[in-house]
UniProtKB/Swiss-Prot annotation:
Domain of life: Bacteria
Subunit-structure text: Homodimer. Heterotetramer of two MnmE and two MnmG subunits.
PANTHER family per the UniProt record, alphabetical: GLUCOSE INHIBITED DIVISION PROTEIN A (PTHR11806), PROTEIN MTO1 HOMOLOG, MITOCHONDRIAL (PTHR11806:SF0)
Entry GO MF terms: flavin adenine dinucleotide binding
Protein name: tRNA uridine 5-carboxymethylaminomethyl modification enzyme MnmG
Primary location recorded for the protein, binned into one broad class: cytoplasm
Residues that bind FAD: 15-20, 127, 183, 372
Organism expressing this protein natively: Ruegeria sp. (strain TM1040)
SUPFAM superfamilies: FAD/NAD(P)-binding domain
GO cellular component: cytosol
List of residues binding NAD(+): 275-289
Entry's localization field: Cytoplasm
Similarity-based family: Belongs to the MnmG family.
Length: 627
């Protein structure tokens, strides 16, 4: 254990989960001395729930984290034992990379990467309090042994540990997750800041012994033959690849669950927190979708050398004996042994409207929050917030400009804006449908959107910079060659490409945007591109496919950026004549940072925005005269 009675760092990150590790790495990459404080060193990078990374919307976040040199994507590629590109039959904008991960490899590789990161120390201990310079300025942390660590900024990533309570049937026990104690004293300290707090819940299914599953009678789901990896630096899979199994609940399963609903912690009245809408418990599915006779279950091995299987789709808070009964009513699981019961966990969260776009608390300077404490669910959402908080905490220490991600340049920006503008009434999960500019926010172009920003911030390694420059040079050369020649309809027809014989000349990029035209189809017309590597061909094809749509979208993006330029001072008064009391209250609670953010508050009207704009312009003119 790294331990000193008194020490000083630039940034301290509390918690070694997905938000904490990403925050610590981001801060350290910025060149500031960073400490990652966690209960146990070997708990860094633990996958508390499902053994998977990515998915629809989530995969976009992982790619964006990687584009800024974050660690989640690289570690997921090392630990991935099955890779699948979701929505493969749809357009690239909504396709989502996903990987089944080996829990053990993921944890070991995340710990290895964290130990190897320069400017970063790992400290074991429980944080019980903050060091305060004033009632509204954090200056470090206090551990349970009363040792102190001073810091310019603190990033809190407590996950489900704040006043965490585990529920199995009518039995409840304190815990941050199964086998770990909760954080009680720190939760009490947060209450003293008079922050808007609430309770949320999440759940996990029983873990099964794969040796007791009848795999032979189940459908098999293999991974993709040509895996789509997360990191722009990865080239191949590292771990052995496996298949998952598929089974379904049935009427007997549903009958067992219905007969025991009152024994469920959720339906028995033991849980007050709201659970995730898009990851409901099996009890919730049976009640909400009463007309369905079966629900799909994915049997996901937790590792290549681990017999544990994660049955994705049957999370529960029913008593353990009922769990065994309903599991064994399912085809292929008739003799399955339950290694660990499923459970629900309830925990404190902070209303994210109390945060700024940097994820620093509005009313407590130097304290940043990231992950489930902000009302989100999912490893990827947590890691993306950790990245934002870590970068901004380091920038605060370096006295650099705040780092704000916009809705027009990243899913990270969409998520942060959603959280701090509208708050949450249930655990927030990322989907591609949340992004209005999703045609340009594709998983495949995350590096083109964000890696240059990483250059400017100083959080990108030379290896990544060199690889990105090489890739962009190749893309630029290829596009230049394709646009250098105008082709007649006759030339295209002679090359086997069907187009309207309208006399209009088109360049190679225009032709690539046609349906069913592949890069190989235009090579007879551009023989100098025959040696273009596959990844560059695919990227240029995707870029050409969306070029016209994105050009039309630019007007909307320009309008959004114009409104984002109207910054709202922290002490701005909403006592504006003509502004309704309801909107005043919502604006006071959310305290938007720009006119664009104010426009997205529920109930906002064009007339109210015009009143605010007039007041902001008047304020700006007054400041100009004063100076």
């Amino acid at each position: 254990m790294f331990h000193v009675k008194h020490s000083h760092y630039d940034v301290v990150v509390v918690g070694g989960g997905h938000a904490g590790t990403e925050a610590a790495h981001a801060s350290a990459r910025m060149g500031v001395r960073t400490a990652l404080v966690t209960l146990r060193r070997d708990g860094i990078g633990v996958m508390s729930c499902n053994p998977a990374i990515g998915g629809l919307g989530k995969g976009h976040l992982v790619r964006e984290i990687d584009a800024l040199d974050g660690v989640m994507g690289r570690v997921a590629d090392l630990a991935g034992i099955q890779f699948r590109l979701l929505n493969r039959r749809k357009g690239p904008a909504v396709q989502g990379p996903r990987a089944q991960a080996d829990r053990s490899i993921y944890r070991k590789e995340m710990l290895r990467a964290t130990e190897a990161q320069s400017n970063l120390d790992i400290i074991e201990g429980e944080v019980v309090d903050f060091l305060m310079e004033s009632p509204t300025r954090v200056r470090g942390i206090i551990l349970d042994d009363q040792s102190e660590i001073r810091a310019e900024c603190v990033v809190l990533t407590s996950g489900t540990f704040l006043n965490g309570v585990i529920h199995i049937g009518n039995k409840s026990s304190s815990g941050g997750r199964m086998g770990d104690r909760p954080s009680i004293k720190l939760a009490e300290r947060l209450k003293s800041f008079e922050l808007p707090l609430g309770r949320l819940k999440t759940g996990t299914p029983p873990r099964l012994d794969g040796r007791t599953i009848n795999w032979d009678i189940l459908d098999s789901q293999p991974g993709d033959e040509d895996p789509t990896l997360f990191s722009f630096l990865s080239t191949n899979t590292s771990a052995p690849q496996i298949a998952c199994g598929i089974t379904h609940t049935n009427e007997k399963t549903h009958e067992i669950i219905r007969d025991n609903l009152e024994l469920s912690a959720m339906y028995g009245g033991h849980i007050e927190g709201v659970g995730p809408r898009y990851c409901p418990s099996i009890e919730d599915k049976i009640v909400r979708f009463a007309d369905k006779t079966s629900h799909q279950i994915f049997l996901e091995p937790e590792g290549v050398n681990d017999h544990t299987v994660y049955p994705n789709g049957i999370s529960t808070s029913l008593p353990e004996d009922v769990q065994v009964d309903y599991v064994r009513s399912i085809v292929g699981l008739e003799n399955a042994e339950v290694l660990q019961p499923g459970y629900a966990i309830e925990y404190d969260y902070v209303d994210p409207r109390a945060l700024r776009s940097t994820l620093e608390l509005r009313d407590v300077e130097g304290l940043y929050l990231a992950g489930q404490i902000n009302g989100t669910t999912g490893y990827e959402e947590a890691a993306a917030q950790g990245l934002v908080a870590g970068l901004n905490a380091a920038s605060h220490r370096l006295k650099q400009q705040e780092i704000v991600f916009g809705r027009s340049n990243s899913y990270i920006g969409v998520m942060i804006d959603d959280l701090i503008t509208n708050g949450v009434t249930e655990p927030y999960r990322m989907f591609t449908s949340r992004a209005e500019f999703r045609l340009s926010l594709r998983a495949d172009n995350a590096d083109q959107r964000l890696t240059p920003i990483g250059y400017d911030l100083g959080c990108i390694s030379e290896v990544r910079r060199s690889e990105f420059d090489r890739k962009m040079d190749a893309i630029t050369r290829t596009k230049s060659a394709l646009t250098s020649v105008l082709l007649t309809p006759k030339q295209l027809l002679e090359a086997g490409i069907q187009v309207n014989q309208d006399g209009n000349k088109r360049n190679g990029l225009d032709v690539l945007a046609f349906p069913k035209v592949e890069f190989d189809d235009i090579l007879p017309l551009f023989p100098e591109l025959a040696d273009t590597e596959t990844s560059i061909r695919e990227q240029v094809t995707r870029d050409s496919l969306y070029a016209n749509y994105i050009a039309r979208q630019e007007k909307e993006v320009a309008s959004l950026k114009r409104d984002e330029q109207y910054r709202i001072p922290r002490d701005f008064s909403y006592e504006i004549d003509g502004l309704s009391m309801e909107l005043r209250q919502k604006l006071e609670r959310s305290r938007p940072e720009s006119l664009a953010q104010a426009a997205r508050i529920d109930g906002m009207t064009p007339a109210a925005l015009a009143l605010m704009l007039g007041s902001l312009k008047k304020l700006s003119r007054g400041e100009s005269k004063a100076s």
